[in-house]
Amino acid sequence: ETYGYIRENVQATFPDRQIGLNTSADFSKVVISSSSDKFPGALHYYDVMEGAIIEVADFAPWLKEYELGDMIPFNFTARDGVELTGYITLPPTYRKGQKIPFIVHPHGGPNAKDSFGYRPEVQIYATRGYGVLQVNYRGSVGFGLEKMKLANKQWSLAMHDDLLDALSLSLIHI
């Protein structure tokens, strides 16, 4: 109950950020980490009894003067019916219907995955006018054993088809 109360208060303070909490044993003191797709992160100290949240460290204060691209999560169905996920980051100057070059930015692995959050290389591309596509193709971790098995012997085959399918679908819908 106490943890839930703390989490609600912190999330209300940082509504557009992902948060992590580390609490003292009695829940009176909290270290907060916060980040987003356009914000690499900060650490805050929260004295629950006083209700005060104080920023301790901003990991990249120099970025505040720049407009960065939005990361948009999406789901899609690959050509063989497999349900997959990905992210598109668009340039901050992008307007609906505008034609832009795209970079397909696959994660390593296959024992890895892309997730929502700040990625410096993605923002570098986006701020230079590129759309960036990140795909959790079959075999990406965190999606269950069955999805992992679908990647067996599929390097340069179905795994690459997943990337191409995601690119085709995202170009239609942006």
Positions of predicted regions on the chain:
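Short, non-transmembrane alpha-helical segments in secretory-pathway proteins
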Residues: 2-15
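Serine-hydrolase catalytic core recognition
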Residues: 8, 17-173
